A protein has these predicted regions:
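Non-catalytic accessory segments flanking enzyme active sites
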Residues: 1, 76-93, 98-103, 111-129, ...
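A flexible loop/linker signature enriched in serine peptidases of the S9 family
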Residues: 1-2, 16-22, 38-52, 61, ...
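A conserved hydrophobic secondary-structure block that centers on an alpha-helix together
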Residues: 1-25, 30-31
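Beta-propeller blade signature
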Residues: 4-8, 50-59, 101-106, 147-151, ...
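Beta-strand initiation motifs
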Residues: 10-15, 60-66, 108-113, 152-158, ...
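Long hydrophobic segments that form regular secondary structure
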Residues: 71-145, 149-154, 163, 178, ...
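Active-site-proximal cap/loop segments of hydrolase catalytic domains
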Residues: 332-530
């Protein structure tokens, strides 16, 4: 990739170009220049890659950029941020067993690197810095808290905002006066505002089933610009005044359709919990038209992600609206491996415990059937990336449970996954095939290896992208070929390869986005109603 620069005030493109950039942010040093991270190897996925931090002064060519930090000797990796007049750099060795913490006072133009120590007993996850105070969350706490220490005296830690049990601290933002904490609890998202001493100021809460994103903070007026959205409601933009608590619509790109076309008020959204086979309460969001009959005959789409501690939330989907309007049911299961119920929820669905994720997903399907939302002959499953793996495991372990499966850009060969592109960075999530115990655990669920002769698997559409450098399409090619090349397979197995597209597809226009939605939901609806 390349980094290019635009003079916003004059609306001019600058001549500066930074090339051979991947997996890097760019952090400004006022308007003088930017810090960026570069890979020593032009093969970005090479195992012997090392990383360097460079400083680019605007107006100079890239060859003159100053080398600030180099990991060539110890083969570590790092993240960096600029806050006020300091650059923070956090270094982790290849085995992720050792961390070092550095900072640079940007007022010193020599950019001298200094090291600081994180107080004992704290699993440090950086949030923000103000003057000489560093704000962080202690990752030992499952739900997330806010703490601080002075960089010149790191032995004393101040607890500012304690964790709230069962309320996940999803994100934080900081203004000159306030700490803004975004929480999530069983389908409800809200913001708590605090002073820097931890004093609670006020709360803003989104309606049930709605998510939101803070787009902009105005330090001068203490206003938040927030976008609200859900599966069935498009983007509603509000301005929230922290000081007064006033809320106002400032821009709304949602043009409400005619009620006869999409009567949004007759959709019901609820977040329930169901019991997993080992007794865990697993959250699941379910959406359908009000007054639906629970007779086991409703076409239903079940999805999940369940990996890397990711916190999944609703996003507006016009294709889903059509599916619901026609009488469909949609469900999203927050299975273990994700981060929806805290850090332990992630740990209990990774590595040697990864099978918990897949069991949770299968248990979600059985719950929907037992509660008469649907039946196995009316149930479709889908997921992307790690969610594609979840679908691949579910359909190969319980082919009797599903009518349709649509895994997207998934990992299916768990014995060789680390040999492809960034697979080596996922050993911590899935396990290492070179370790005997972990190899056996991977082989126990690897979708490609679990395909059996004599089994008729569900009608399946495997979607991949030819230029996917996160999960290369070879996973999908192999999975599709083995499913297709068996005499017992009577249900159709389709492979869709998106050209000139990467891991997230190629949604370069509204028309292509609509086309992708139409293809997906049409496939699901048609085969659920055969």
């Amino acid at each position: 990739h390349e980094i290019r620069f635009v003079d916003i005030l004059n609306q001019n493109n600058l001549d500066d170009v930074l090339k051979d950039i991947k997996f890097s942010n760019a952090a400004w040093n006022d308007d003088k220049g930017v810090f960026y991270k570069k890979n020593s190897n032009t093969d970005f996925f090479a195992k012997d890659s090392t990383y360097q931090l460079y400083y680019h002064k605007l107006g100079e060519i890239q060859d003159k950029d100053a080398l600030i930090f180099d990991t060539s000797k110890d083969e570590s990796d790092f993240r960096f941020f600029v806050r006020e007049n300091k650059l923070f750099l956090f270094e982790t060795n290849k085995e992720e067993t050792k961390r070092l913490y550095h900072y640079i006072n940007l007022s010193d133009e020599t950019f001298k690197i200094k090291e600081f120590v994180v107080p004992n007993g704290n699993d440090f996850s950086y949030l923000y810095s103000k003057e000489d105070n560093v704000y962080f969350t202690n990752s030992k706490y499952d739900w997330g808290d806010v703490r601080s220490f002075n960089i010149n005296n790191p032995t004393e830690v101040t607890s500012i905002i304690p964790q709230i049990y069962s309320h996940l601290l999803v994100d934080t933002d900081f203004t000159s006066e306030y700490i803004i904490c975004k929480y999530r609890n069983l389908g409800r998202n809200y913001i708590n505002i605090h002073n820097y001493d931890g004093t609670f100021v006020r709360k803003f809460e989104a309606p049930m089933g709605m998510n939101f994103k803070i787009r902009f903070l105005d330090n001068k007026t203490n206003e938040l610009y927030v976008t609200f959205y859900s599966y069935t409601i498009s983007y509603l933009n509000y301005k929230l005044n922290i000081t007064t608590g006033d809320t106002n619509v400032y821009y709304n790109d949602f043009i409400e359709p005619k009620p006869t076309l999409f009567p949004f008020n007759h959709f019901e959204t609820k977040t329930i919990t169901y019991k997993s086979r080992d007794g865990k309460d697993v959250p699941m969001t379910i959406i359908h038209k009000k007054g639906i009959q629970l007779n086991g005959k409703n076409p239903t789409l079940l999805e999940a992600y369940g990996g890397f501690g990711s916190v999944s939330g609703p996003s507006y989907d016009v294709g889903l609206l059509h599916f619901l309007e026609k009488g469909g049911v949609y469900a999203f299961a927050e299975i273990r491996g994700g981060g929806e119920k805290g850090r332990k929820w992630h740990k209990d669905g990774r590595g040697l415990k990864k099978m918990n994720s897949f069991n949770d997903f299968i248990d979600a399907a059985e719950f929907l059937i037992s509660e008469k939302y649907t039946s196995s002959n009316k149930l479709a499953i889908s997921g992307a990336s790690n969610g594609g793996l979840v679908v691949g495991v579910a359909m190969t372990q319980r082919p009797d449970l599903f009518k349709v499966a649509v895994p997207k850009v998934g990992v299916y060969d768990m014995i060789k996954f680390e040999q492809y592109t960034i697979g080596k960075f996922h050993l911590d999530e899935y396990g290492n095939p070179e370790n005997e115990e972990e190899f056996n655990a991977l082989l126990n669920y690897s979708p490609y290896h679990k395909i059996k002769e004599g089994v008729n698997y569900p009608t399946t559409l495997i979607i991949t992208s030819e230029n996917d450098d996160r999960v290369p399409p070879v996973h999908s090619y192999k999975f599709a070929a083995r499913l297709q090349n068996r005499a017992a397979q009577k249900n159709p197995i389709y492979l869709q390869v998106k050209s000139n597209a990467g891991h997230y597809g190629k949604i370069s226009s509204y028309e292509k986005s609509v086309q992708a939605d139409a293809e997906f939901y049409s496939f699901v609806w048609e085969h659920l109603n055969e």
